Structures are given as structure tokens and as C-alpha cells.
């Protein structure tokens, strides 16, 4: 029984020592994130749709900052996001990638034709924001409040029962386009 407690104490001391070493190493050898990547990532819409060719907003921000990727590939963010990134990086704005720029693009949501849905769940697996609910061999539906209109669920559907449709603006869904409202920062003078 005495050997048992010695073994427990030895393993506990080893765990404590290795934990302290790992804690010290994590602070001593920490790699600082690129602040430009952080700022670009904050500007991007965080829809994680992949329309830019990257698996999410963070990898796209890293590609812009580190690899010189074009700043005009974010379809959900549109021109407003591209202009903010251009201002941050102090580069010339570029037209949107392959599309005519629109100041206020219509919000699109996926709609499933429930009569043709076979419940294969391929659209659920493709949706980056989990806006589609349903079960295997059961009818699926899209939660329009969560849908970003990224179009990633349309191609995997074997019965082609998913389409994107514009959302009609109602008093409940209408929002100010805050990107068109000019904002000026006025420095405050402190008098002592």
C-alpha cells in the first residue's frame, strides 16, 4: 500500500513539473498573431461561405495579408467590405471579382422545394452556418434568419430542389445600410 502512494505522489509531481514547464514555454515562446490579419478578419462578414476560394474568413484574411491575395473576392461582404479592406491596407479599390459592383445587393436565401426533397442531407453537410434542418429521408427546410445566401448548398443537391431567392424587405427585415453613412472621428481637445 505504501508503494501505491509513492507512485501516486511521483506521477503527481511529474504532472505538476511538466505542466509548469508547458505553461512557461507557452508564454516564453508564444507567437504573436499578425495584427493586420486580425483587423482584416474583423472586417470580413464571418459567413465562412468559401466563395472566395478559402475555407473561411480567417484563411482569406491571412492570404490577403501574407500572400497578397486580391481584396475583391468576398461576395457576401460586397463592395463595402472591399472598400474597408482597401482603406486599411492603403491600396486602390478593385471591382468585385467577376461581378458588377452593387452598393446594396439584394439579400438572398436558399429555398428548398419540399415536394422534390429526398432527404439526402448533402445540403446540410454543405451549409457553413447550419441554416438547414432536417433528417435522413425526411424533408429539409432552411432557417431564413441564419441563411447567408452563400450558394454552397445548391450544387450538392442531387434533385436540384434548392434555389436562391431574394428576400423581400419588410419593416422587420429592413436594416440601415450603415456603410453608406459617413463617419468622421472628431478629436477631443482636453483643457487642463
Swiss-Prot record:
[4Fe-4S] cluster 1 binds at residues 49, 52, 57, 74. Residues 108-137, 138-167 form the 4Fe-4S ferredoxin-type domain. It is an enzyme of class 7 (translocase). Its main location: membrane. Residues 1-26 are annotated as: Hydrophobic. It is found in: Cell inner membrane. It comes from the Bacteria. Keywords: 4Fe-4S, Cell inner membrane, Cell membrane, Electron transport, Iron, Iron-sulfur, Membrane, Metal-binding, Repeat, Translocase, Transport. Residues 32-91 form the 4Fe-4S domain. One of its GO terms (molecular function) is metal ion binding. Disulfide bonds: none annotated. GO terms for biological process: electron transport chain. Its EC number is 7.-.-.-. [4Fe-4S] cluster 2 binds at residues 117, 120, 123, 157. The complex is composed of six subunits: RsxA, RsxB, RsxC, RsxD, RsxE and RsxG. PANTHER family: ION-TRANSLOCATING OXIDOREDUCTASE COMPLEX SUBUNIT B. Part of a membrane-bound complex that couples electron transfer with translocation of ions across the membrane. Required to maintain the reduced state of SoxR. Belongs to the 4Fe4S bacterial-type ferredoxin family. RnfB subfamily. This is Ion-translocating oxidoreductase complex subunit B.
Amino acid at each position: 500500500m505504501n508503494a501505491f502512494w509513492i507512485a501516486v505522489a511521483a506521477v503527481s509531481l511529474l504532472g505538476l513539473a511538466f505542466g509548469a514547464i508547458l505553461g512557461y514555454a507557452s508564454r516564453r515562446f508564444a507567437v504573436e498573431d499578425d495584427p493586420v490579419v486580425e483587423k482584416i478578419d474583423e472586417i470580413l462578414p464571418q459567413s465562412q461561405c468559401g466563395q472566395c476560394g478559402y475555407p473561411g474568413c480567417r484563411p482569406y484574411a491571412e492570404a490577403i495579408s501574407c500572400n497578397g491575395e486580391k481584396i475583391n473576392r468576398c461576395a457576401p461582404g460586397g463592395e463595402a467590405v472591399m472598400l474597408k479592406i482597401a482603406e486599411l491596407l492603403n491600396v486602390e479599390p478593385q471591382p468585385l471579382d467577376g461581378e458588377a459592383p452593387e452598393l446594396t445587393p439584394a439579400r438572398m436565401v436558399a429555398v428548398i422545394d419540399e415536394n422534390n426533397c429526398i432527404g439526402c442531407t448533402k445540403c446540410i453537410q454543405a451549409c457553413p452556418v447550419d441554416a438547414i434542418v432536417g433528417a435522413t429521408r425526411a424533408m429539409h427546410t432552411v432557417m431564413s434568419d441564419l441563411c447567408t445566401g452563400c450558394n454552397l448548398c445548391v450544387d450538392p443537391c442531387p434533385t436540384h430542389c434548392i434555389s436562391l431567392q431574394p428576400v423581400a424587405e419588410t419593416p422587420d427585415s429592413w436594416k440601415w445600410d450603415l456603410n453608406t453613412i459617413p463617419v468622421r472621428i472628431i478629436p477631443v481637445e482636453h483643457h487642463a
